């Protein structure tokens, strides 16, 4: 497993924690919004391991503002990381998967990509765009032994969410039929399934992991 990210300090910390648990995870500092950097990183992975079986695209940022106040820079920055970055990563690994006749690509969308969200025109556009990208790639690559799917998380207990006021968290929970926020490991389980051979006949799907928010 190789993790690409821009934050070297957090990447190295993750690498150490994984090693302490007996997991072989390598961190590589990569800006996924830079196509040349991603292409070079993919080559390093292929050279080291001989192949690339699975790609999970979960790099993402937010830069929220209403349409009236949103700057072009805010718009473009989120597009570059969330949407273009996913395209770049898929493009960079594709030939390795085609050569092997096998691949699993899982893209991180969001429930807001399905129904929108106030003050997030840029972010929602990327998450909705990822759904369209996923379905199109699934049609193109399915016969090549490569499946492409997406996960659409709802409200998840992340470090950022944990800092929110309790009344805000209560409002979030009230919108979820199961009455609680999701856990990171529940999202990870969805990724793991879609990346596995058990999901070989799942292609072009958008798996909502949201406690029923989108029902």
Predicted regions located by residue number:
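Conserved glycine-rich Rossmann-like NAD(P)H-binding loop of the short-chain dehydrogenase/reductase
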Residues: 1-13
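The beta1-alpha1 cofactor-binding region of Rossmann-like NAD(H)/NADP(H)-dependent oxidoreductases
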Residues: 8-9, 29-43, 72, 185-186
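Substrate-binding pocket helix/loop in short-chain dehydrogenase/reductase
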Residues: 66-67, 74-79, 161, 172
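Active-site helix of classical SDR
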Residues: 90, 126, 134
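Residue(s) in the substrate-gating loop at a strand-loop-helix junction
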Residues: 110
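Short, small/polar-rich loop/turn modules that mediate ligand/substrate recognition or access, typified
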Residues: 142, 147, 202-204
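C-terminal helical subdomain
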Residues: 150, 173-198, 202, 211
